[in-house]
Amino acid sequence: MKRLLTVALGFLVSVGLWGQTAFEEIAQQPSKAGGIYHMYPESGFSRPTPAPKGYKPFYISNYGRHVARFNSSNSMYDRFDQMMQKAHDDNALTEKGEDFYRRYHAQYPYCINRGGDLTEKGANQHRGIAKRMFTNYPSVFKGRGRIDARSTNVPRCILSMDYFCDQLKRLNPKLEIEKTVTRDDMAFLNPHSLVNPSVTPTDEGYNNKYAYWQDNYKAMCRENTNPEAFFSRLFKDWNYVKNFTDDPMKLEIDFYYLACSNQCLDYEESYWDLFTQEEINLLWEADSYRFFCSKGPDDIQGGRQWAFCKTLAEDFVKGAEKDIEEGRCARLRFGHDIAIMSFMTLMNIDGWSTPAPTPHDAKDLWQDYNVQMGANIQFVFYKNRKGDIIVRFMNNEEDVLFPIESAIAPYYDWAALKAYMEERIAVAEKIIATTQAPPKK
């Protein structure tokens, strides 16, 4: 009983249920304001919960998000340089604006044509995750263990797979790792792509312009931004920015994304000083709400988006069965944040699956910074001498509890966990069959 209480208390701490609000978390750890650009920690992980007596780990199945990268938009970097250079030449900048101009002008050459590229910080993130996995589960990666590694066909994910697998090979050169990159795997590695036969063009991606939730998201953006106040600190006349955009609100949000993504770069520069703390909080809230609506438990679309992730759930189940039968020691997958968001919601994990009564309630129920650069989910399989199999599930290397009974939580009987996952897959199939893709507007 004492052990179960310890696990439960650890889980409560890990999901922030001691009354701390999201804004308080951001004040305590400012990098969380970066949302999905939040950096994966290098240390501070809980010690693995001891397995029941007689059980040893023998197989791992994971899904890892790519690690730290540049902002995905090359054009954003270019537009900022062109705008600030012109404003400087026109003597249109305030003292604070000139300071930003000097700092950004120095950074810009480092960013040219690097949109979406991984950084060395990112490479080190996956080396660290791989090393901890190897160290925590040496019995999995012993001898000539065979590993199946797969990535989406996006370069940053392929490189993430390489960094991870290369680290494992350095730790045990005998490992036999087969790496695969094929469009066919996108159906489960990127469940919101058109390779998934359930997805239509108006369902595709994470920010589809036809999505049912876009109106709610845009309304929050209008409420949470103040372009006049923000740009008045940078430009002598804030209306000057209208020479470069017909949507000052979006430009303010782009400044926020620049600040978010800069923490991922090897180039040391921060732009959070451009914002007040209230602006940071509100901009983060709107961005997190976008993902909450798109791939989280917002009920405006009836669960359709997270239901697409049934393909990943199916691959976890079928892949584990296949690998255990054929003697592999691990199956490693590398992809994107939205798959992890959707999977956690699909599995009805506490802290990931609660709808918000109002848009502004979402921020304290669900936070996008929990799917930071390098975010991951891991199923670790254990067995005893009789061949009984139990599984522990982790999100970002911390134990997570499934909503099913287990006297040995955070460990679960594999047959029971598989049955639960198949139930959730059936729920997802019903949702997809009974909901409609958004119409083209």
PLM regions and their residue ranges:
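Signature for phosphate-centric chemistry
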Residues: 20-146, 152-331, 335-441
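Bacterial Sec-dependent N-terminal signal peptides
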Residues: 1-22
